[in-house]
A protein has these predicted regions:
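Generic long, charged, amphipathic alpha-helical segments
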Residues: 169-198
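Short strand-edge motifs at loop-to-beta-strand transitions and within beta-strands
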Residues: 6-10, 190-192, 198-204
Length: 235
């Protein structure tokens, strides 16, 4: 599962394919990001011509037109990553809660819409500290626009993090099975997909820079409707 705003590097080897061969990169069908009990995007920015959410589709096609010689080789060992240990977090037993929900006509984080130059005390961290954050994509049973649950790709500015765990509500397990094998949670990230009813724990170190940094949903309709906040790194 590749979230809006998320990036991965792919090494593709076409050397054994014949000239004229075509290879497609396809997005497979899934249901785990469906708007629970509602319609696509809750009616926001929707179109009758848009494909169904989770539909299979071809992303792009590659055609082999000629043979070339290439000397690039993958290294025997990739660079080691400076991974953190969950137990080293200052709040290892009580992760910082980040709740995503719909409040009236606004998408909010911890019940708060975006404020340009503000970070609340609960959004303030210490420079060089290691923390766990727990992002919860709350279902909204009585939500307007029939938007009871949507996927949120959450992007943090100024820091890279590790995904250390995912949990999903039992009633959403069937949809979860269609997406769980598609996650690439290894390594360091700055964007993570959080499905409806899902709980995701992140581990990160706030180093090098102090100041105000944004964190937000990378679905632009949600970000523009308020699902964006700041956190502050203090020395």
């Amino acid at each position: 599962m590749l979230a809006p705003g998320e990036r991965i590097d792919i090494w593709a080897d076409f050397s054994k394919l014949k000239v004229g061969t075509e290879v497609s990169l396809n997005s497979l069908a899934f249901s785990g990001a469906e708007n629970v009990g509602g319609t696509n995007m809750g009616g926001m920015m929707s179109s009758d011509n848009a494909p169904e959410l989770g539909s299979a589709m071809m992303l792009f096609n590659v055609k082999i037109e000629r043979k070339e010689k290439e000397t690039l080789r993958l290294p025997n060992q990739l660079a080691a990553l400076p991974l953190l240990r969950p137990e080293d977090a200052v709040n290892a037993t009580q992760p910082r809660p980040i709740e995503l929900s719909l409040k009236g006509m606004k998408w909010v984080i911890n019940g708060q819409p975006f404020e340009m130059n503000t970070a609340l005390p609960q959004e303030t961290v210490k420079l060089n500290s290691i923390e766990q954050w727990e992002i919860v994509n709350k279902l909204n049973p009585g939500a307007m626009m029939d938007a009871k649950g949507m996927a949120h790709p959450i992007h943090l500015h100024g820091v890279h993090f590790q995904v250390i765990s995912r949990e999903v509500l039992p009633e959403l397990a069937a949809g979860w099975q269609t997406v769980k094998d598609g996650y690439v949670d290894e390594g360091l990230k700055d964007t993570v997909m959080v499905m409806p009813g899902e709980r995701v724990k992140l581990l990160m170190k706030f180093e090098k820079y102090s100041g105000l940094f944004a964190y937000h949903c990378h679905t632009l309709e949600h970000e523009d409707a308020g699902m964006m906040r700041n956190y502050r790194v203090k020395e």
